[in-house]
Design a protein with these regions (language model features):
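Low-complexity, glycine/proline-biased repetitive segments and flexible coils/loops
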Residues: 3, 11, 16-24, 39-261
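The right-handed parallel beta-helix/beta-solenoid scaffold, focusing on the short coil/turn
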Residues: 7-9, 25, 30-32
Length: 261
């Protein structure tokens, strides 16, 4: 979306999407009188991972890649703008979020988010949150938070680094029934801690490729003041009476129970 300013067209691929991917969507540039090349800024955010089901870790944020501003997801430098040609179709894939894990005797971890693609730019889906009985979290654009058991601190998932870093790792679960927070675009998820307190999710990245008014209209990102944040990590589950918060950038909060599983 957006308009050309000084021969720069801004394209945003992020927001709230259905669970199923939007595949084979075409971006067509036509009816334009241009002097090649047309350079575009972009923000591509993948689907976030699903949180773990039973004393689970938070889902990791989907990977975030952008050419706008000074940094991209994971703290790397902003990426190179793309060059597009009028009259050419460019395929888009909008990745869906991963499913949350199942609670109960047959508890499961969440599932990974799916990738988002714009032209040659691919952002990796977020890692899943760990859960009883397998508390290890999954890797992704940002890693999922580790789950918890009575004997094991479930390790958080790693953030992918290839082809570029896109987010941060998930926090570790704590054996006293506290899941780790999912990683966000700028900070890692927090570890679960004693007292059965789940870890908070990692923070997303402020990218004002759209101003706050346009982002609100388009239902993308999370607004804070005049800034728009993307790709926060989910909060981890605890066994106390307060839910761990998700990181700024549209993430969900962790759940809680009144005691251990």
């Amino acid at each position: 979306s957006g308009t050309g300013v000084d021969n720069v067209l801004t394209v945003t691929l992020a927001g709230v999407f259905p669970g199923a991917d939007s595949l084979n969507t075409a971006l067509t540039l036509s009816g334009l009188t241009l002097t090649p090349p047309l350079t575009v800024n972009y923000l591509v955010a993948a689907g976030g991972g699903g949180g773990g089901g039973q004393v689970g870790g938070g889902g990791g944020a989907g990977g975030l890649r952008t050419s706008y501003g000074s940094i991209t997801g994971g703290g790397g430098g902003s990426e190179t703008q793309l060059t597009l040609v009028a009259g050419t179709n460019y395929a888009l894939t909008v990745g869906g979020g991963g499913a949350a894990g199942v609670v109960g005797p047959s508890a499961t971890s969440g599932t990974v988010g799916t990738n988002s693609v714009f032209s040659t730019i691919t952002s990796s889906g977020g890692g899943y949150g760990g859960s009883l009985p397998s508390p290890t979290a999954g890797a992704g654009g940002s890693g999922g938070g580790g789950g918890a058991t009575t004997n094991v601190n479930g390790p958080g998932g790693a953030a992918v680094t290839s082809p570029v870093i896109q987010g941060k790792s998930g926090g570790n679960g704590f054996y006293s029934w506290a899941g780790g927070g999912g990683g966000g675009a700028t900070t890692a998820g927090a570890n679960g801690v004693t007292g059965a307190i789940g870890g908070i999710g990692g923070s997303g990245l402020s990218v004002n490729i759209l101003n706050s008014g346009n982002a609100t209209t388009s239902s993308v990102g999370e607004i804070s003041g005049s800034d728009v944040y993307y790709a926060g990590g989910g909060g981890g589950c605890g066994s106390n009476t307060s839910a761990a918060s998700g990181g700024i950038g549209g993430a969900g909060n962790g759940g809680y129970t009144s005691g251990g599983p």
